[in-house]
Amino acid sequence: MTENYRGCYEYLSAQYPEVGGYEFYKELFPDNENSGERHTDFSHPNAVYLYRDEQSEDKKLRRRKMYNDTWEHDYMEFVEGNSLTLCSGLAYRRKENRLENAQRMYALIFDLDGVGLAELRNLFLRFGGDPERVRRLPMPTFLVLSGTGLHVYYVFQQPIDLYPNIKIQLKSLKYDLTFRMWEYGSTSQVKAIQYQSINQGFRMVGSLNDKHGTELVAFRTGERVTLDYLNAYAKPENRVDVNKPFSPSKMTRAEAREAYPEWYERVVVNGEKGRKKWDIAGKVHGDDPYALYHWWLRQIGEIKGGHRYFFLMCL
């Protein structure tokens, strides 16, 4: 047992109720099929998890659907005490837990490594604060001790249907909140931020982290959330709009030339496929002589741990 794990367990167990693994996943995925049911219209997607087959010689990872009526037995047989089990916050069509098969999101989950008692306390100073303030974070539904840090669960009041455009938007939202959450020297002891897919699998509650010999333990820290609640903590361009239609542009080349003449000249005529460079001289000698300074001010929420003094120097 690491010092980080021990300190975080003592802190959380003194303030929040512990939730067992069986109950945790029953609450997370209340709509799983019963064994033997077959819905060909994809109306009942299931959670899918991976577990290490301790009986096989090669200790191979095997995939299994999470069924409602057999979950108690399956949890004790395949998850509890297992050295490696993985499950995401999504439900899938068919048995493969691939992103293209993902149909609903029940929870948005974050992996935060390098969390000790000091980092955990800093997180709680930020959880539930004013979303307009820098680095404030939504209050999670559950915190899970992973052995090396925390798994942060935001469980939705209603699952999110994963249309292709919604998957893309949720990825942007997760990346935005990951940046807010992971701050070296404050909320994590690890410098490099780890950005993960919305389809990422996480070690399951009640299983063991075989690298550290610790059990994954969950604590209920808050309520279920809505997309609007999470959106409030992200930049406007990274928020999820479930009503936003996904349709490719039907604009013709002639219409694009008329509507976006500068872009057309640069990309179509001149073949410049790279990103447009910022014309600093043109900005400074244009309407805003302090354009560069104002640009740096807008980056205040993007500064990574270890670079704050450089940011202040630029100002």
Descriptions of predicted regions:
Residues F110, R136-N165, Q169, Y195-N209:
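Histidine-centered divalent-metal-coordination microenvironment in nucleic-acid enzymes
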Residues T70-W71, G185-V269:
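Catalytic "initiation/cleavage/transfer" segments centered on a nucleophilic residue
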Residues A118-D130, F156-S186, H212-A232:
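Helical (often loop-to-helix) elements that flank the catalytic cores of nucleotide-handling enzymes
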Residues N4, P17-G20, Q169, G222, ...:
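Non-membrane alpha-helical secondary structure
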Residues R104-Y106, T148-L150, F310-L312:
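Residues at beta-strand starts and edge strands
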Residues D113:
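Anionic group-transfer/hydrolysis microenvironments
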Residues M1-A107, L117-N122, G129-V134:
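DNA replication initiation on ssDNA origins
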Residues Q158-I160, D241-L315:
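Modules that initiate DNA replication and primer synthesis
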